[in-house]
Amino acid sequence: MPVSPKQARTLKHQLWVAFLVVPPIVFMSLFVVYPILSAFAYAFYDWQGLARGEFVGLKNFKEVLFGATMAPVVWNAFLHNVYALIALMIIQNGGGFFLAWLLYKEPFGFRFHRVAVFVPVVLSTIIVGFLWKLFLNPNFGIINQALYSVGLDALAKPWLGDSSTALGALILANAWHFVGFPALVYLAGMQRIPLEIIEAARLDGTNEWQLLRNIVWPLVAPSTTILFTLLFIGAFNWFEIPYVMVGLDGSPFGSTDVLGLVFYRTAFGNQSASIQNFGMGSALATLLFLFIVVFASMLTLWLRRREIQF
């Protein structure tokens, strides 16, 4: 049966679409969907990585949540993830908002500053981790040297070796690394605000703080929704910065332990615990995945209800 030119064009278009769509679907299925489903399955087995052991049902989940050995480590790490989330919401996203406002007002050289703010974001997280590890070195790090130079010797300390400052140091390094991203997202949101609204508020005698709090902040709510959701996901997937700066053990004395490190140690072992337990590691990963999906969805819905359309 002869094919009309229109049918031929339609067929060609469909083949081209299939050519573009099928490879990514296959790639995602092999390297994303299959590993996730496999992790769900492994969580129900006593599996050490070589040969699948016996089916243990919910035993791995119970051990992760309530076990005498595993649960205290998991809950300690979970609290550190929560602390990181709260601190990064204030420092990283809050700092990004104020940086965006400064850039929005287009100060002298603002194009250079806009690029400079974003440069740390494109750096490798491994490089950033090593860089801040050098900055915080107690002997020759730039932080302590700066304190010595201004006579504040009493404030100098081993930042990564002190339980009271180690987690804060990691949070600071992470905020420096990524603050440029929320800054540019908020800047894009601010540039969408009609100038008439800003000018009318200024004519009414609104000061800078009132303008930010009552006008700008509510109108960039869509940007806030995106950034808080991404930060929530990132905070509970936190791994690279702690791993590079303090190692797998969450030193000192577990004060920097986070769920990503606990998962890695459990599934793959480390220097002090070489036993691998993929089953329990998969159970932890499954619980973390479900927690992130559920609460990130709830957070997104709650924030979207607070958005203002203009």
Task: Please place each PLM-identified region on the residue numbering.
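A structural signal for multi-pass alpha-helical bundles of membrane permease subunits
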Residues: 10-310
